[in-house]
Amino acid sequence: MTITDLVLILFIAALLAFAIYDQFIMPRRNGPTLLAIPLLRRGRIDSVIFVGLIVILIYNNVTNHGALITTWLLSALALMGFYIFWIRVPKIIFKQKGFFFANVWIEYSLIKAMNLSEDGVLVMQLEQRRLLIRVRNIDNLEKIYKLIVSTQ
């Protein structure tokens, strides 16, 4: 097993750990889930480039008669990338004392202001930064507003 294979195993393990945390652990942290809203995906061009580069590496490994384990590890990495970028749905998870956005816990007390932009993006001004929340269904913005008002 080469250093390349070890690095591939490390990346596959990291992506698998992230997927397990995102799907199973995060919804159970910090109390029961009050509301989970699916969000719009960001630009997919990065994911196309990532998976495309992995496919090029697989092709290069096969044509140069590289190690079979490397081909399988590259294929597993491409599948993990496909799952994370195209199958997994990003979401915002609201709890009793705060919410998870982009896998980061944010307490309601940190929200200084909330605005709704013309194109349906909820803007939350925090102490240090601004969150732009793009929901998949515009009707979910009303659910978010009602939940935040009722918990404050």
Curated annotation (Swiss-Prot):
Gene name as annotated: yobD
UniProt lineage: Bacteria, Pseudomonadati, Pseudomonadota, Gammaproteobacteria, Enterobacterales
Top-level taxon of the source organism: Bacteria
Compartments, as annotated in UniProt: Cell inner membrane
Keyword Zinc: no
Pfam family, one: DUF986
Membrane topology: Multi-pass membrane protein
Protein name: UPF0266 membrane protein YobD
GO annotation, cellular component aspect: plasma membrane
Entry annotated with the keyword Cell division: no
Family the UniProt entry places it in: Belongs to the UPF0266 family.
Transmembrane segments: 6-26, 45-65, 67-87
Keywords: Cell inner membrane, Cell membrane, Membrane, Transmembrane, Transmembrane helix
